[in-house]
């Protein structure tokens, strides 16, 4: 049974501008393991990665029905690439839940969809 579906989209230029003004934005959005993956990339691919993770985490919060705030922050949600390159939510996963995530990019935006199944 589906618990929730979340969808989010973000403009790459917006993420680039935020990152230029506040380099610590990375630490507010990404976990330590995600930062290690982020640091492997260069140039525009870094912005795509960060924007994709931001959108995926927003989509997760929507699918979870909580949004971000008092009980959930960006760094509470971790999305890592598995060996075949797919994104995989590694935390938080509640017992009995399966989380599906898809991230995509265009030249101007990143989007993500999350489905939580119980």
Swiss-Prot record:
Q: Quick one: a GO cellular component term?
A: cytoplasm
Under the heading HAMAP family, the entry gives: AcpS
**Function of the molecule:** Transfers the 4'-phosphopantetheine moiety from coenzyme A to a Ser of acyl-carrier-protein.
Localization, per the record, is: Cytoplasm
Cofactor requirement: Mg(2+)
Picking any one GO biological process from the record gives: fatty acid biosynthetic process
User: What reaction is this protein's catalytic activity?
Assistant: apo-[ACP] + CoA = holo-[ACP] + adenosine 3',5'-bisphosphate + H(+)
The alphabetized UniProt keywords are:
Cytoplasm, Fatty acid biosynthesis, Fatty acid metabolism, Lipid biosynthesis, Lipid metabolism, Magnesium, Metal-binding, Transferase
Q: Read off the Pfam families from this record.
A: ACPS (PF01648)
Cross-referenced NCBIfam families: acpS, pantethn_trn
The residues listed in the UniProt record as binding Mg(2+), with positions renumbered to this chain, are 8, 58
| Annotated protein name in UniProt | Holo-[acyl-carrier-protein] synthase
Gene Ontology molecular function, alphabetical: holo-[acyl-carrier-protein] synthase activity; magnesium ion binding
Report the sequence similarity comment from the record: Belongs to the P-Pant transferase superfamily. AcpS family.
Main location group: cytoplasm
UniProt EC number: 2.7.8.7
Stored Gene3D superfamilies: 4'-phosphopantetheinyl transferase domain
Main EC class the enzyme belongs to: transferase
Does the UniProt entry include the keyword Glycoprotein? no
């Amino acid at each position: 049974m589906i618990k929730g579906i979340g969808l989010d989209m973000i403009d790459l230029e917006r993420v680039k501008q935020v990152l230029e003004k506040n380099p610590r934005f990375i630490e507010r959005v990404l976990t330590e393991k995600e930062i290690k993956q982020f640091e492997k990339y260069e140039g525009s691919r870094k912005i795509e990665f960060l924007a994709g993770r931001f959108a995926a985490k927003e989509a997760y919060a929507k699918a979870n029905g909580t949004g971000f705030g008092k009980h959930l922050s960006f760094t509470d949600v971790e999305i890592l690439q598995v060996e075949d390159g797919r994104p995989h939510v590694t935390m938080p996963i509640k017992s009995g839940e399966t989380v599906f995530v898809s991230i995509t990019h265009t030249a101007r935006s990143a989007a993500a969809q999350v489905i939580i199944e119980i």
